[in-house]
């Protein structure tokens, strides 16, 4: 499950893993009980209904925004290896009930660990959108039906292997959320 010997805080890591594992076991047991009580078809339909609800709610909120293209930039002074600044450039396109986060103008990926994989860029973009307009909506796959995230492989917002990406989660991702 977890090898605590290669951690800076082995005891805390091990206790954390045990707690997560225990909560997953409880969640699994309770989820299976809901399926037994209600039936798999009903539970599955509820999942799809919740996604439809989220999509509809987010489309309504996006429609309330003025259509247009909005620009933003965030700069990192360096990547920890070179003294070169790196820019994240966003074109946010609002069109009716859809929204596009376009990061294709961002700088090429860095040698240092400030890059982000696509999934981190997607997650940060969706989180920013939820913070701005959708805080009351359930978080599920319905969000992805109205939002597109566009990046270019090999940039600091879509790192290509063997590029480093730890700072993409801890530094550049929060910068997208303001």
Q: Model-derived features: where do they sit?
A:
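N-terminal leader/propeptide and maturation segments of large enzyme subunits in energy/redox metabolism
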Residues: 1-58
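Hydrophobic core positions in small helical hairpin nucleic-acid-binding modules
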Residues: 3, 10, 20, 112-113, ...
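A generic structural motif
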Residues: 13-16, 105-110
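Flexible, glycine/charged-enriched surface loops at secondary-structure junctions
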Residues: 35-48, 65-75, 134-148
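Flexible loop/turn segments at secondary-structure boundaries
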Residues: 42, 54, 78-83, 99-100, ...
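Short, hydrophobic/amphipathic alpha-helical packing segments
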Residues: 51, 55, 122-130
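Flexible, glycine/threonine-enriched loop-and-boundary segments that flank and lead into catalytic domains
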Residues: 68-91
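Short beta-strand elements
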Residues: 86-105
């Amino acid at each position: 499950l977890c090898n605590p010997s290669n951690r800076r805080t082995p005891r805390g890591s091990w206790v954390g893993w045990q707690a997560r594992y225990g909560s997953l076991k409880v969640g699994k047991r309770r989820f299976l009980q809901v399926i037994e009580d209600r039936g798999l078809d009903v539970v599955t339909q509820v999942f799809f209904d919740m996604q439809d609800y989220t999509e509809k709610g987010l489309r309504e909120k996006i429609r309330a925004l003025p259509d247009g293209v909005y620009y933003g930039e965030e700069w990192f002074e360096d990547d920890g290896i070179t003294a070169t600044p790196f820019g994240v450039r966003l074109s946010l396109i609002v069109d009716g009930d859809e929204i596009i986060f376009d990061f294709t103008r961002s700088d090429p990926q860095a040698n240092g660990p400030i890059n982000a994989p696509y999934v981190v860029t997607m997650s940060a973009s969706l989180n920013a959108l939820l913070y701005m307009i959708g805080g009351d909506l359930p978080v599920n796959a319905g969000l992805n039906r109205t939002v597109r995230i566009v990046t270019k492989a090999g940039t600091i917002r879509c790192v290509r292997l063997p590029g480093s990406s730890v700072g993409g989660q801890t530094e550049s991702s929060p910068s997208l959320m303001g």
